[in-house]
């Protein structure tokens, strides 16, 4: 048997189907379809995955800086790797707009960071951090989104968001 292998695949996915399948929060604010490509690497019984898309054809009614017209490309890269001690690391990069890193062990979130704009994307020692550094930040729009009072299903049917341990927001004065 082989100890390593690689697979390259691609296709087009509809955002509403992904939202429904994964229970993504605020999924009612995303629409459209986009082409994607993926590479799966298997080495020594560990699987690493990379998914990339230009999100052309997907629109977002999320608050800035995550709003996007369907006709505008925005590079998305999602990586899943096996980290130390059986942990899984998930890293997502959305152009120069956002980054996120999640560390999970046995499907339990151990620590994570979400960074918008030029926010620091380093993982906290423990818990969940959100760091935002953008020219303008609409706190009311984000509060509405996080409260689940947006348009559409109002957040019903989506997975709940974890409690935040660190929140940092920086805007020019």
Language model segments and positions:
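Membrane-proximal interfacial segments on either side of biological membranes
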Residues: 1-90, 102-173
């Amino acid at each position: 048997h082989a100890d390593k292998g690689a697979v390259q695949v691609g296709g087009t996915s509809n955002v509403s189907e992904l939202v429904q399948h994964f229970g993504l929060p605020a999924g009612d604010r995303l629409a459209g379809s986009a082409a994607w490509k993926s590479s799966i690497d298997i080495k020594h019984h560990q699987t690493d995955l990379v998914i990339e898309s230009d999100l052309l054809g997907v629109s977002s009614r999320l608050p800035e800086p995550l709003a996007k017209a369907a006709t505008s490309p925005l590079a998305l890269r999602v990586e899943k790797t096996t980290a130390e001690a059986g942990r899984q690391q998930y890293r997502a990069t959305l152009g120069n707009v956002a980054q996120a890193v999640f560390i999970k062990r046995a499907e339990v979130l151990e620590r994570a960071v979400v960074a918008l704009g030029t926010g620091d994307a380093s993982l906290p020692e423990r818990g969940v951090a959100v760091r935002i550094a953008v020219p303008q930040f609409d706190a009311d729009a984000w509060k509405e989104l996080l409260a689940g009072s947006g348009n559409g299903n109002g957040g019903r049917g989506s997975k709940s968001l974890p409690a935040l341990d660190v929140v940092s927001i920086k805007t020019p004065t």
